[in-house]
Amino acid sequence: MTEDSDDVTLVRRCCGGDRQAFGTLVVRYQKTVYNAALRMLHDREEAKDVAQTVFLKVYENLGKYDPKFKFYSWIYRIALNESINALQRRRPTEGLDLDAPDGEPGPEESLGQRQAHDGLQRALMTLREEYRAVVVLRHFVGCSYEDMGEILGVPEKTVKSRLFSARQLLRKALQKQGMTQ
């Protein structure tokens, strides 16, 4: 039995009231959900909160899951949406922290690197959610175009188009900051 078909079986059991089946799904996907949130938020406590919210939403909406799609993609999309919601709740001066979680820049990091990092963070935060999501999924999570399309619920061509547009918008935002040639 593949993990996909096993997930569908677990979802059906959950919908039938089997709490142990839901516990199995939580154990199977808790690291995936937490890491997805952590990569977007770069805050361990906030990522834990988002992960809890994700599993609550998953439990409440299991009846809406369409087994034609991978459960992984469905839950990852919920995690991504909840992470974006958490980013929006932050104060405007806070943003997408690209440092290692809870990490401070090391002594080897030069002022120029720090300025470039801060400039990129500011530029990313100027992007609309749909563009920021593709940049984060591709360049920070390392998703394939196919996986991104499934997670975002759009065709692969749309993913590529959004990523192209996002890169152009990032380039313009960085130019406004005097960060590119």
Show which residues each predicted segment covers.
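Structural recognition of an alpha-helix C-terminal capping motif at a helix-to-coil junction
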Residues: 35, 49-56, 69-81
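A short pre-motif secondary-structure segment
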Residues: 134-138
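Arg/Lys-rich amphipathic alpha helix in sigma70-family domain 2
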Residues: 63-67, 77-96, 113, 165, ...
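Short, Lys/Arg-enriched C-terminal cap helix and immediately downstream tail that follows
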Residues: 88, 127, 132, 167-181
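Sigma70-family region 2
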Residues: 15-16, 39-42, 53-70, 89-91
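DNA-recognition helix of helix-turn-helix
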Residues: 73, 80, 84, 146, ...
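Internal acidic/polar
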Residues: 3-4, 85, 92-117, 144
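Short, charged helix-capping/linker segments at alpha-helix termini
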Residues: 1-3, 15-24, 34-53, 156, ...
